[in-house]
From Swiss-Prot:
Protein name: NADH-quinone oxidoreductase subunit B
Gene Ontology MF terms in the entry: 4 iron, 4 sulfur cluster binding; iron ion binding; NADH dehydrogenase (ubiquinone) activity; NADH:ubiquinone reductase (non-electrogenic) activity; quinone binding
The keyword NAD is assigned to this record: yes
Record key words, sorted: 4Fe-4S, Cell inner membrane, Cell membrane, Iron, Iron-sulfur, Membrane, Metal-binding, NAD, Quinone, Translocase, Transport, Ubiquinone
Cofactor binding: number and manner: Binds 1 [4Fe-4S] cluster.
Quaternary structure (record): NDH-1 is composed of 14 different subunits. Subunits NuoB, C, D, E, F, and G constitute the peripheral sector of the complex.
InterPro entries linked: NADH_UbQ_OxRdtase-like_20kDa (IPR006137), NADH_UQ_OxRdtase_20Kd_su (IPR006138)
Membrane topology category: Peripheral membrane protein
EC identifiers of the protein: 7.1.1.-
Subcellular location: Cell inner membrane
Matches recorded under SUPFAM superfamilies: HydA/Nqo6-like (SSF56770)
Catalytic activity from the UniProt record: a quinone + NADH + 5 H(+)(in) = a quinol + NAD(+) + 4 H(+)(out)
Length: 168
């Protein structure tokens, strides 16, 4: 029997003598995480030159729609925040406020050297040395600026991380 949601290995693990033997929570976690990972809606928080590469990722060449990734402008409609660029002390409060407005579960991708650890401006008095000091980060994308392929790979890594998550 072929199942659309479970792979053959998972189906073989859950199947025993024609019955589906599992804890109800395991199966619901699997289905929920499968659905969540296939419909990521990132919100852009472009702060510097990395935002240009983020826009490049949204273009037709990379076609994020085929992965279920659609950019949203509102934090209430998105579940992923992409922090792209240098985070200053003045923008840190706005970043946290926007993050708090997102619905749970919410994920953060830190894109570029500046968002990861301050980058070129690390020693400046007005730069936060990594957005992980303000919001919890799930995936770090290195580079200055990282390529569109690197951001796409980071999104795919986030999808895999969501699939492996246990909800309860």
């Amino acid at each position: 029997m072929t199942n659309q949601i479970l792979s053959n290995d998972d189906w073989g693990r859950y199947k025993k003598e024609g019955f589906l033997v599992t804890k109800f929570g395991d199966l619901t976690d699997y289905v929920m995480n499968w659905a969540r990972s296939g419909s990521l809606w990132p919100m852009t928080f472009g702060l510097a030159c990395c935002a240009v590469e983020m826009m490049h990722t949204a273009s037709s060449r990379y076609d994020l729609d085929r992965y279920g990734i659609m950019f949203r402008a509102s934090p209430r409609q998105s579940d992923v925040m992409i922090v792209a660029g240098t985070l200053t002390n003045k923008m840190a409060a706005a970043l946290r406020k926007v993050y708090d407005q997102m619905a749970d579960p919410k994920y953060v991708i830190s894109m570029g050297s500046c968002a990861n650890g301050g980058g070129y401006y690390h020693y400046s008095y007005s730069v936060v040395r990594g957005c992980d000091r303000i919001v919890p980060v799930d995936v770090y994308v290195p580079g200055c600026p990282p390529t569109a392929e690197a951001l796409l790979y980071g999104m795919l890594c986030l999808q895999n991380k969501i699939k492996r998550t246990r909800n309860g």
